[in-house]
């Protein structure tokens, strides 16, 4: 049974089931199918020969049995992801539950499925999984949790329910379909695309109506994500999913890789118009589809409107800024100028005093030290600053960058600015530890902590001079850009932890975030800061700070780990700094004492 024959059967069964759907002859059938009369005549003749139609375009018993055996069995809806591109509205609700015309997207999909008699619906959830629970009562759907949703792509979501794939629709949760894309009858496997050309699409529609896949294609038809997989092809797909998931290199793959790449599945193209199926992947796409959606009323959007005296329609080009260990930031444009909205991440209210941060920004205002600030809320930490176009972070492998950063840091320290709060490293070490819900994962933590805190005596003997210190003076927070005069300048950003402290702490912080593995690298940076004139006492003191700050951020990482956030090599290296530089500092202190 080829695609054309099945299309005719499906059209004629609809005529029998819907009195208002009238087809009296082949010409009317051709109009419904948007085919030529000659093609319809050819297909009808073949169906009659095969015993599926009589002379009056009426389905035979054989045809009805065939169609009854061609009913879809179930549906898998993929709804586990974060929806990162939906900033800022992805922070309170999964995008599957965003409302268009007062109905959540996923509810519209479920009801469209019910319209064609499909009630066996499985939803793969992950981010904010609890928000989907009500659907089990309202629609009798099944929820399956993908525990790896935060670190793997939707190939793994489909793998969680691969045993269910057989005569199955696979549907992404973020689509709004103006007309029902599902049917009571399906026979062959297909994947839905539209007529628009997408430069990043690896599939294109061939003359035979199939999809041709090639990663090397420069462009192809825009992929929607909806597919139907029949029982025969499902066997191949499930095997391919298993093969791909066995290799960690495929963690970021989409499920379509299993469908198209290195398989014998012939996938038909179901081509729709681009305005029939709309993907809602951003705040702006939702606004374009439903400008009255209640989801558009967002706290950060309201702040932007107030600060810049604009409406939400004036806010354009919104996209997430992934960098940042504690914050969820996004970039936006108002009146042709770009800005960054910083929204503090979960749990940061325990770690950062936003009133103190606001005090710091007021203190450094006018010194051309940091990015231009337009708004900061001392209560919730929401912040708007100018986005530096064509900027870049410090390259820790570039000696010129390192020298420039150390000069910027030294010039800032030489201002001797003061605020009314300090950053007490010893208190912070204990504070982060107090947030733990379990013992340290490091077996020798207690001894390591005792050793590192013992360095305080030497630091105090140096009588460090306190001034406003950045604390988080890491390479990523030094932004290089070209100013209006064509000269390169550096802005030091992200002052959340800043307070009164020995300014030499900033040197240690830069080193440990750079993950320097060799002592010579740290010595080189110290020499850049001091122009080669660092005293032995100051050098040892910085070694002490490397150990202390390593323990500090190791404790911070342990707290975040217990919340389910991992930082990989960074967290392991911080603990190593605590242990290794305690030894180095202790040895150098002994040498210094012998010289006295």
Q: Whereabouts are the PLM-identified features?
A:
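Conserved core of the sugar-phosphate nucleotidyltransferase
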Residues: 7-9, 20, 178-253
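N-terminal glycine-rich phosphate-binding loop and ensuing alpha1 helix
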Residues: 9-28, 32-34, 65-129
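Conserved alpha/beta core of the MobA/IspD/sugar-nucleotide pyrophosphorylase nucleotidyltransferase superfamily
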Residues: 13, 55-75, 222-306
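Conserved beta-loop-beta/alpha segment of the NTase-like Rossmann-fold superfamily
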Residues: 132-202
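ATP/Mg2+ or Mg2+-diphosphate-binding catalytic cores
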Residues: 284, 290, 296-298, 555-596
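An alpha-helical support segment within catalytic cores of ATP-dependent transferases
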Residues: 299-314, 417-471, 475, 481-484
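ATP-binding pocket architecture of kinase catalytic cores
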Residues: 319-426, 439-447
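Active-site activation/catalytic loop segments of kinase-like enzymes and analogous catalytic loops
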Residues: 504-534, 547-565, 579
